[in-house]
Regions:
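Alpha-helical scaffold segments in soluble metabolic enzymes
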Residues: 22, 26, 142, 168, ...
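Short, flexible helix/strand-to-coil boundary loops that buttress conserved ligand/catalytic motifs
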Residues: 49-50, 125, 147, 189-190, ...
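Walker A/P-loop nucleotide-binding motif
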Residues: 159-160
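A Rossmann-like FAD-binding core segment of flavoenzymes
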Residues: 33, 81-98, 105, 172-249
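Beta1-alpha1 glycine-rich phosphate/pyrophosphate-binding loop at the start
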Residues: 7-80, 166-189, 193
Length: 249
């Protein structure tokens, strides 16, 4: 039974990324008056994650340029964005969602657009400082701060994020190594010719690429990562490590 004081919303969107933002815009174009609420776990208005591993990381664009719309857009279109207040429970049968602050919203229509979280490596030393998983603005900014004192970077994972980070680190002058479990970069998403082209490009930028190789341990000193051990017996010196090994839904 729904509580008498529960707010009712025609359209609820859980997730403030590209998909959630686009959905809110599309709904407002078709329904000019129905209440639209976007629930965001992060403290920011919806932003584009694509530049986080490229132009924003490299300092080519300002922080405000990653945001999809300015605050006035949401006010003008009466789209409510609830920041830093993630959904914690969903009752499909009763058609309501509970938020972290205890607020409950009843809904007519619900869109789940939460994306995923970076998959974590469960190996020795995973708790050391200097190991980064790129997902949000704060992750990129933490990497930027670490870059100020770094000379050597190890990227674990040769997918899109890993390749983009490796290219960026090389552009910034870091000695960069990519550790990839499979025989080729991006092997699950591109054809062999494209994979070979990307590998050649990175190598031309000075990136060392180790395929058929797995990270087995993060080695550290004074609580900070200093090297990555692999299943081939290598120990790769590192001032920072970036991990991009897929997402967990």
């Amino acid at each position: 039974v729904k509580e008498a004081n529960m707010e009712h919303v025609p359209y609820v969107i859980i997730g403030g990324g590209l998909a959630g933002n686009a959905a809110a815009e599309a709904i407002r174009r078709r329904d000019k008056t129905g209440r639209v609420v976007v629930i965001c776990a992060e403290p920011h208005l919806p932003y584009d994650r694509v530049p986080l591993s490229k132009d924003y990381l490299l300092g080519k664009i300002e922080r405000q340029q990653v945001f999809l719309k300015n605050p006035r857009f949401y006010e003008r279109n009466t789209i409510e964005v609830l920041l830093h207040n993630p959904a914690t429970a969903l009752d499909v049968a009763q058609r309501h969602v509970t938020l972290a602050n205890g607020q409950q919203l009843g809904f007519d229509k619900l869109l789940l657009a939460t994306g995923g979280r970076p998959r974590r490596l469960a190996i020795a030393g995973a708790e050391l400082e200097g190991i980064y998983y790129l997902r949000n603005l704060e992750d990129t900014e933490a990497i930027q701060r670490s870059l100020q004192d770094a000379r050597r970077a190890v990227v674990i994972g040769g997918g899109f994020i890993g390749c983009e980070l490796a290219a960026g680190f090389a552009q910034l002058g870091l000695q960069t190594t990519v550790v990839e479990l499979t025989p080729a970069l991006l092997s699950l998403v591109v054809d062999p010719e494209t994979s070979a082209f990307i590998m050649s490009y990175l190598q031309q930028q000075g990136v060392t690429i180790l395929t058929d190789t797995a990270a087995t341990e993060f080695m550290g000193a004074q609580g900070r990562v200093r090297a990555v051990a692999t299943n081939t017996g290598r120990e790769i010196a590192a001032d920072l490590v970036a991990v991009g090994v897929g997402i967990a839904l």
